[in-house]
Regions:
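Short secondary-structure boundary/hinge segments and terminal tails
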Residues: 45, 68-70, 170-171, 200, ...
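Hydrophobic alpha-helical scaffolding
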Residues: 37, 62, 94, 168, ...
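Generic structural signal for well-ordered, non-membrane alpha-helical segments
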Residues: 37-44, 69, 97, 138-145, ...
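N-terminal capping/small domains of soluble enzymes
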Residues: 1-98, 365, 369, 375, ...
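Catalytic alpha/beta core domains of metabolic enzymes, predominantly
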Residues: 196-339
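Active-site beta-loop-alpha junctions enriched in small/polar residues
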Residues: 26-29, 62-66, 93-97, 120-124, ...
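Alpha/beta enzyme core
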Residues: 21-23, 33-56, 73-84, 98-217, ...
């Protein structure tokens, strides 16, 4: 499709090879940092499974330099190689210092390590003064960051993104200097972090367009929701990238979870690029093969796994997202749901009907289950485990780790990829 739109910023969208939108989900890094909640390593594995099914480009899977993440990272590498996550790219997050990176690149499975990294360091004068407290100045920030980029590339990384933490409070001059130094060291993108969520759509678009033009590489959005603007800011930041002729990379989290008030919600952001009335937005080309038929299952699974109930008005997947009661609205929706609905709820996929949620007499499998119950459940799901004995042990271990009944999708993944998942429990399975 060829689109023609000259917007108020002077961006000519007429191109068959126009820049594209990509989604880099950070649920397994920023999302799991959410206070008062948590996610097991098996749960983080399921996030990658769902992101792969949804068609997202990349998952920031966690912290490969941390000792307790190492078995998990190895399992993700093995699962990706086995095809469990489709075309999903896996990336690791490190602080923007070479010591973290040197540890991370040593984590391997089957001789392969992570191919993608994001390296983060604070750039604002506020954080230099009040976080580092004189330990680092601007020159030191650039020195540490460039050394980290070179270490990642020397360790085999295909792509490296450099994160300007508190980028929204960093002046244009230093942001440009930081990004150009990163590019010279081998970085492929710079992540502009609206760390405390104070940016606004017009401001962030202007800054992205200016920065992406100045450095000649994509500026990645990382927007927090402290003012309720994370999705809007992510969209406008991406438009600034496109205006500068660069691909846009948008950070998201499932259900908008994340530090404090959360991050840009994955589903809301995708739906905006598909259904917003502004042709600059719905006319932007998404470069990822998004399959929204997995959206509802992912969102509801995440609510269950994180133990965070979805608000009734959660975009697309809340209980009231397609509910009508008042007279005028109900009448209009009964005649044609398009009168009061922007998109069809069926496009978001079916509601899960998990084995463990059945009522009445039911036989389950889990931490203390036996072979008969395990076989009964697998037969009921129509699943033939690749390795029955190993899958049986993994069901017990995963149930013990999550402290909740396993879902049908979790049981299917265990049955299909038991050898790779066993790496999560290094030393626990003989």
């Amino acid at each position: 499709m060829i689109l023609v739109n000259i917007d108020t910023y002077g961006f000519d969208c007429q191109s068959e090879g126009m820049p594209q939108i990509h989604f880099l989900d950070v649920t397994n890094r920023d999302g799991v940092q959410t206070a008062r909640t948590g996610l097991s390593k098996f749960g983080k594995t399921m996030v990658n499974f769902y992101l792969g099914r949804l068609g997202v480009a990349q998952s920031e899977i966690g912290f490969p330099f941390l000792f307790h993440e190492v078995p998990y990272v190895r399992a993700q590498i093995a699962l990706a190689e086995a095809g469990a996550f489709g075309d999903l790219r896996l990336s690791g997050w490190c602080r923007g210092v070479p010591q973290d990176v040197e540890k991370a690149v040593q984590v391997r499975a089957g001789g392969k390590g992570l191919a993608h990294y994001n390296l983060s360091i604070s750039t604002s004068d506020y954080m230099l003064a009040n976080k580092f407290r004189g330990k680092l100045d601007r020159d030191a920030v650039i020195r540490e960051m460039t050394a980290a980029v070179r270490a990642a590339k020397a360790g085999g990384a295909r792509t490296v993104g450099v994160n300007a933490e508190d980028g929204s409070r960093t002046d244009d001059g230093f942001l440009t200097e930081f990004a150009l130094a990163a590019k010279e060291a081998g970085a492929d993108r710079v992540r502009y972090c609206d760390t405390i969520g104070g940016d606004t759509p017009d401001r962030i678009r202007e800054r992205f367009a200016k920065l992406a033009s100045a450095v000649g590489m994509p500026v990645e959005t990382h927007c927090h929701n402290d003012l309720g603007l994370a999705v809007a800011n992510s969209i406008h930041g991406a438009l600034g990238d496109l205006q500068a002729g660069q691909d846009a990379w948008i950070n998201t989290c499932v259900n908008g979870i994340g530090e404090r008030s959360g991050n840009a919600d994955l589903l809301s952001t995708i739906l905006a690029f598909r259904h917003a009335f502004d042709p600059q937005v719905n006319g932007s080309e998404i470069g990822d093969p998004i399959d929204l038929s997995w959206a509802r299952r992912f969102a509801l699974w995440a609510s269950y796994a994180f133990g965070q109930p979805l608000p009734y008005n959660q975009v697309g997947v809340g209980r009231n997202a397609f509910a009508h009661e008042s007279g005028i609205h109900a009448d209009g929706a009964l005649k044609d749901h398009g009168n009061y609905e922007l998109y069809d709820d069926e496009t978001l996929g079916p509601f899960p009907d998990d084995w463990h949620a059945r009522r009445g007499r039911v036989v389950l499998t889990g931490e203390y289950g036996g072979k008969a119950g395990f076989r009964h459940v697998m037969d009921g799901l129509g699943v033939e485990p690749a390795d029955e004995e190993l899958s049986f042990k993994l069901v017990q271990l995963c149930n013990a780790q999550t402290s909740r009944p396993l879902t049908d999708d979790e049981l299917r993944l265990i049955a299909e990829y038991p050898r790779e998942l066993a790496l999560l429990f290094s030393g626990a399975i003989e």
